[in-house]
């Protein structure tokens, strides 16, 4: 083995170093200021401890706090400090696992008395003391026997179980920070002092060990950490905004929907909420029709044999709702399942009747009700449910048509998002996973086509970010994932485009090619909203309940100041309704400020106020949600203006084009 390694620097230059040299020494050899800023280093993208020897040649990167990758290290190290603080303050508490998660970290603890929110300030204070000690992170590699013995002697039974679960031949790494240590894969920064003070413990929750309800209940402490105070405060402000916009609270205030114990994870839509849902369906239906889709509908309940053929029974059975019918009146004991997906049903429709290459592409769309079992702890309002509606579509095409169809789908997806005000979109290509069906040659062709499509999208759209997710594709083909950013900076993965060579083959779907031979079609799975319930939840939070006029379930309230205006208010409401607007009248004997405040809480976009004077002059006072201003105008002028504003964006484009 060579004693030297060749390292390529970011500027392209290549230098040789002794293989035993550490990352810290290398950083110092470049400059002392860089050595002070360094928190880790990477070779060929693999992040390593500064104390690790270089070992191998490759592309070198010195990671500082400003590097996005440093954030994971900061959060990882903070989780370790949290665990040390807890054990200092509460002797006898067992530590289990403490991973980095999106926007922060958590650590699970086993303790007879669960932690409460009141404990968090005390723990935070101790954490800051530990960080101030600036103890170095040092790594040791232990034998399995030593690790089990040490943790067993400390009464850490969960750590012993974790040691047992580590595959044979894999190093057992132990990281020290002063005298305290933990089992960990690493990497870590150089010392606790590099963490800084830009962290906060957020909440406590219960969590079963290994996520299994048969195991003991642990206490999970969640926290977050950032590289600086500005980022931390921005995140905390975003959380405050998110709480104000929580669709569950707004759903109650706006009287849109509710959930109840008898139907966990399924939505009870109220009249206003269902109107909003239907607005979304109507909009999507028009968009699909204009893009050549045929809307279909497939059964909710199907025999398990179909799911066995599709592969869902083997891959997805535990997440499916099974249906059996037993009793004297039944003549069989067949097992059925509520459909978790619409795709097998669409293949059946494609197979019904002979198809020619001249018929392709065939685009089948469905607003399909599907059911998937989700653990009760994972359910979250409209965002995570057990029963939902997919805006599902499947395009059956030739391999040669695949690129053009993916581009057509992309144009439609981006157009829909833009109509709802989402301009910042990220598209990522997920490539072949380790477990997959189909030959490498087939995957090569599919990924090549989708890489070309992604490049075309990147060139056509300056505001679209793109990326690659290696190994994250579906088992049957590569896919695009569309992520949109909302009004407060949160990202939501919604749309997907997935290429599938597997399902048509499983079901024996074919078309007759130009050579009169049977050919297997490519099947492209496509969703824009994904779950329409979830998309509505995203919209409610994005707009904080203040929906665009064209989408609002109640667009206008006609409210009276005095009973002298009741008849005029009814007349005005009738004209507004005749013009196609969603209108409610409020003739109650209440003060107008009370009425305005109440309808504002329900996020009604426009309130038309009528008093005796307005009734005599055939005018209205228009008030907009979120504004204290009011504008007087004739009723006809108000109708004309509101009808223009209430025209859905797709219909407005058609109107303007005409």
Swiss-Prot record:
Catalytic class of the enzyme: ligase
Catalysis performed (reactions): tRNA(Thr) + L-threonine + ATP = L-threonyl-tRNA(Thr) + AMP + diphosphate + H(+)
Keyword flag Cell membrane: no
Domain TGS: 1-64
Compartments in which it is found: Cytoplasm
SUPFAM superfamilies documented for this protein: Class II aaRS ABD-related, Class II aaRS and biotin synthetases, TGS-like, ThrRS/AlaRS common domain
A Pfam family of this chain: HGTP_anticodon
GO biological process assignments: threonyl-tRNA aminoacylation
GO MF term (any one): metal ion binding
Alphabetic keyword roster: Aminoacyl-tRNA synthetase, ATP-binding, Cytoplasm, Ligase, Metal-binding, Nucleotide-binding, Protein biosynthesis, RNA-binding, tRNA-binding, Zinc
The keyword Nucleotide-binding belongs to this UniProt entry's keyword annotation: yes
Lineage: superkingdom: Bacteria
Sequence segments annotated as region (Catalytic): 246-548
Quaternary context: Homodimer.
Family as reported in the entry's similarity comment: Belongs to the class-II aminoacyl-tRNA synthetase family.
Protein name: Threonine--tRNA ligase
Organism per entry: Brucella abortus (strain 2308)
Taxonomic path: Bacteria, Pseudomonadati, Pseudomonadota, Alphaproteobacteria, Hyphomicrobiales
């Amino acid at each position: 083995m060579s004693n030297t390694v060749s390292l390529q620097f970011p500027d392209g230059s290549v230098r040789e170093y002794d293989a035993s040299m550490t990352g810290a020494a290398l950083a110092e050899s470049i400059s002392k200021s860089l050595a002070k800023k360094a928190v880790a280093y990477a070779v060929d993208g693999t992040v390593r401890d500064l104390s690790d020897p270089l070992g191998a040649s490759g592309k070198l990167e010195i990671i500082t706090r400003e590097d996005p990758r440093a954030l994971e290290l900061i959060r990882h190290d903070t989780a370790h400090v949290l665990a040390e603080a807890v054990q200092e303050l509460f002797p006898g508490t067992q530590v289990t696992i403490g991973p980095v998660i999106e926007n922060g970290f958590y650590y699970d603890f086993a303790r007879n008395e669960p932690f409460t929110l009141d404990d968090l300030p005390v723990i935070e204070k101790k954490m800051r003391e530990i960080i101030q000690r600036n103890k170095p992170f040092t790594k040791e590699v232990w034998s399995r026997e030593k690790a089990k013995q040490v943790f067993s002697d400390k009464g850490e039974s969960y750590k012993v179980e974790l040691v047992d679960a580590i595959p044979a031949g894999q190093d057992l790494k132990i990281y020290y920070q002063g005298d305290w240590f933990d089992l960990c894969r690493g990497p870590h920064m150089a010392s606790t002092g590099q963490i800084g003070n830009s962290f906060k413990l957020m909440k406590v929750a219960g969590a079963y060990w290994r996520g299994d309800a048969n195991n003991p209940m642990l206490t999970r402490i969640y926290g977050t950490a950032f590289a600086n105070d500005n980022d931390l405060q921005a995140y905390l402000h975003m959380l405050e905004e998110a709480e104000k916009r929580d669709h569950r609270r707004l759903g109650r205030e706006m009287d849109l929907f509710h959930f109840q114990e008898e139907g966990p994870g399924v939505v009870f839509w109220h009249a206003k909420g269902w109107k909003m849902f239907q607005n979304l369906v109507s909009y999507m239906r028009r968009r699909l029709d204009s893009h050549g889709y045929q809307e279909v509908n497939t059964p909710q309940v199907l025999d398990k044999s179909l799911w066995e053929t599709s592969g869902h029974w083997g891959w997805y059975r535990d997440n499916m709702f099974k249906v059996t019918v037993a009793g004297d009146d039944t003549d069989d004991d067949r097992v059925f399942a509520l459909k978790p997906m619409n795709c097998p049903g669409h293949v059946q429709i494609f197979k019904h009747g002979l198809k020619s290459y001249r018929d392709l592409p065939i685009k089948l769309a469905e607003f399909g009700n599907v059911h998937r079992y989700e653990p009760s702890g994972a359910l979250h309002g409209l965002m995570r449910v057990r029963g939902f509606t997919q805006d599902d579509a499947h395009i059956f095409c030739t391999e040669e048509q695949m690129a053009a169809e993916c581009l057509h789908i992309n144009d439609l997806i981006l157009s829909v998002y833009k109509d709802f005000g989402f301009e910042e979109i990220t598209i990522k290509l997920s490539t072949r996973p380790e477990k997959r069906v189909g030959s490498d040659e087939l995957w090569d062709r599919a990924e090549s086509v989708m890489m070309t499509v992604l490049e075309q999208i990147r060139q056509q759209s300056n505001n679209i970010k793109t990326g690659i997710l290696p190994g994250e594709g579906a088992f049957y083909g590569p896919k695009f994932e569309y992520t949109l950013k909302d009004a407060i900076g949160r990202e939501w993965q919604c749309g997907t485009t997935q290429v599938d060579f597997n399902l048509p083959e499983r079901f024996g779907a074919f078309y007759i090619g130009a050579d009169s031979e049977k050919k297997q079609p490519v099947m492209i799975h496509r969703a824009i909203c994904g779950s329409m319930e979830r998309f509505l939840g995203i919209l409610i939070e994005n707009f904080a309940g203040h929906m665009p006029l064209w989408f609002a379930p109640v667009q206008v309230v006609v409210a009276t100041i005095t009973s002298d205006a009741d008849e005029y208010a009814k007349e005005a409401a009738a004209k507004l309704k005749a013009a196609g607007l969603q209108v409610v009248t409020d003739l109650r004997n209440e003060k107008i400020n009370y009425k305005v405040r109440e309808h504002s809480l329900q996020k009604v976009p426009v309130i038309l106020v009528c008093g005796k004077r307005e009734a005599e002059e055939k005018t209205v006072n228009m008030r907009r949600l979120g504004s204290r201003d009011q504008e007087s105008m004739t009723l006809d002028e108000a109708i004309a203006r509101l009808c223009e504003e209430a025209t859905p964006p797709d219909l407005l484009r058609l109107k303007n084009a005409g």
